[in-house]
Amino acid sequence: MRFSAVAGRYARALLNVAIEKEKEEEYLRFLDLVCQIYESSRELFDNPILKPEKKISLIKEIMKSFGQEMDEFQERFLTLVFERKRQKLLRNIRDLFEYEKILSEQKVPANLSIAHSPEDEELSLLRKFVRKYALKDPVFDISIDESLIAGALVEFEGFRLDTTVQGRLKRIAREALKRGEMS
């Protein structure tokens, strides 16, 4: 996924407010809910005829139906986003907010692809590995991919560890092609 520089500025600004108010998790849940609301009715929220104030009041009403309230900073944030017609960046802003939040906690985001649901022991070993090289605790974004057959693929800070059967088979095939053993 490509991230927008504009989305990064919005995400960092909102994160700064969240850190100041000590409500990082609450603001992340707020962004999750706003993204779900926006994505479920994209045509409505992208309609140029509707005023930004009306769009925000609709979001407020929907949030109330879920038992959620919006504070003044969240409302001002949404006002800026909708007035400047940046609502299409909401998912990007949410993802960057989460990424920046992890970095602000002195942790490292890491992608973990694994063929099955990971057990605690496996996660512990992978945490130790990432800690050894990144010198920070990892926050795993876990995805299950059965095509890997077995093993795990970990990516963090530009580093990639591939212990999957699929990865090994690809390396063997690549080496065989280099040597001219396969035609």
Swiss-Prot record:
GO CC terms, sorted:
plasma membrane; proton-transporting ATP synthase complex
Q: Which SUPFAM superfamilies match?
A: N-terminal domain of the delta subunit of the F1F0-ATP synthase (SSF47928)
Q: Which GO terms describe its biological process?
A: proton motive force-driven ATP synthesis
Membrane disposition: Peripheral membrane protein
Superkingdom, taxonomy of origin: Bacteria
Annotated TM spans: none
**Alphabetized GO MF terms:** proton-transporting ATP synthase activity, rotational mechanism
Q: Which family does it belong to?
A: Belongs to the ATPase delta chain family.
Q: What does this protein do?
A: F(1)F(0) ATP synthase produces ATP from ADP in the presence of a proton or sodium gradient. F-type ATPases consist of two structural domains, F(1) containing the extramembraneous catalytic core and F(0) containing the membrane proton channel, linked together by a central stalk and a peripheral stalk. During catalysis, ATP synthesis in the catalytic domain of F(1) is coupled via a rotary mechanism of the central stalk subunits to proton translocation.
Assembly, in brief, is: F-type ATPases have 2 components, F(1) - the catalytic core - and F(0) - the membrane proton channel. F(1) has five subunits: alpha(3), beta(3), gamma(1), delta(1), epsilon(1). F(0) has three main subunits: a(1), b(2) and c(10-14). The alpha and beta chains form an alternating ring which encloses part of the gamma chain. F(1) is attached to F(0) by a central stalk formed by the gamma and epsilon chains, while a peripheral stalk is formed by the delta and b chains.
Report what the protein is called.
ATP synthase subunit delta
- Which lineage do the record's taxonomy fields give for this organism? Bacteria, Thermotogati, Thermotogota, Thermotogae, Thermotogales
